[in-house]
Every structure is written in structure tokens, then in C-alpha cells.
Amino acid sequence: VVALIISALIRSLLMQLYVIPSASMENTLQIGDRGAVIKVADFHRGDVVVFKDPGNWLGNETSGTSNPVRQVAEFLGVAPSSATDHLVKRVIGMPGDHVACCTAQGQITVNGQPLDEASYLYSVNGVSVHPSDLSFDVVVPAGHIFVLGDHRNDSRDSRYHLCDAVESGEVAGSGGFVPISDVTGPMVGIFMPFNRATRFAIPATFASVPDPAPAPDQPTVNRKPC
């Protein structure tokens, strides 16, 4: 029993399980999928990450209250988290990255490099959705990331929150960036249902993105969709 408890405690420090609550990451993640997040792993441009709501992105939604047994199981990492104050998106921009939409061909660019997103964007009958119907042009500040859902037409992500109201003294558009300190970790794959079990890899298109300039302390928002 002691060995099982120790094992569970170690697992709780290293890994957390999450249930996907929405369609914003389809087709990569479906509603009800169980994903595994590694808490101690670094993440990179192109990774799928879970993060705490950085600024009322979820509106009035709040975490439900689960029973004590469930809470212990979640803490130990043996039951998927039932919290509703976390989101899952794909990292498009890391600190210093210049992210813009869109080219004449309709592609998002990172540091001037167009992304070929066909491998992960939501698709219907093999036809991917447009990378973004919203125009934006930003430089990601130090200590933050820029995230998008794979189902771009059904995802309230960094694009939308560039238009959020900000506190006095903050740069307009600051609400569109997620503090790295709010990131739980990268989601490494789906473990349930078993017929969808898979391990995630960073899409090949991100390997062509050049290194960014040094990240500014404050975001640069050249264009936002509002």
C-alpha cells in the first residue's frame, strides 16, 4: 500500500490527466478524450498545452466541486482532472515570436515563415478550415505564449482576447497572451478512449520557423481583430 501511495504521489508531481470539455481542438482532440499532461516537461512552438485561465477567457464558467474521494484521486493523478478553469490550445508563438495573419495565400506566419497547418487544422471531408478569419499582427512578450485552437472557427483563443479590456498601464492587446507561469505542461497524447489513443508530436512545419529576436518586456500589437 505504501508503495502504491508513493507511486501515486510521484505521478501527481509529474503528470496530470485531463478530460477534453470542448470542440476547440478538433480534430486533434475530441470532446471526452482523456489526455495526459507532463508537468515537468518543457514545451515548444507547436506543442499542445494545458494552462490555467489567464484572464477570464472562460467567462463565468467556474470549477465544479467534486466529492472528497474524487479530489484525492485527481490530486494523486489517478483520475482525470474535473476542473473547468483550465484550457487546452496549441502554442503558435513563443516569447519574441512575431505572429501574423495572414499572407495572400491565407497562411499564418511566425517570424516571417508561413505555416502549413493542414496536418492538424480541423477539417471536413479532408478540407481544412481557414487558418484564421481574424487578422492580427503581434510580437509575443517575454514570459508569455500565443495560442490557437485547431478548430479555428470554434475556439476563443489568443486572437479574440487581443480585444479584451486591460488594466490601467497595460498595453492594449495584453489579454491575448498566456503567462508561461500559468501553463501546466504539454499534453503528450490521448490515452482514452483506446481507439483514439495516440502520442502527439510537434508538426513538421514548425521546424522551419527561424529563431525570434529577443522578446520585448511588453507585447507589440501591430494589428488586432477589433
Task: Annotate each predicted stretch with a short phrase.
Residues 25-31:
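Membrane-proximal juxtamembrane linkers immediately C-terminal to transmembrane helices
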Residues 22:
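A short acidic/basic microdomain associated with nuclease active sites
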Residues 13, 18-19, 31-226:
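Soluble "head" domains of membrane/secretory-pathway proteins
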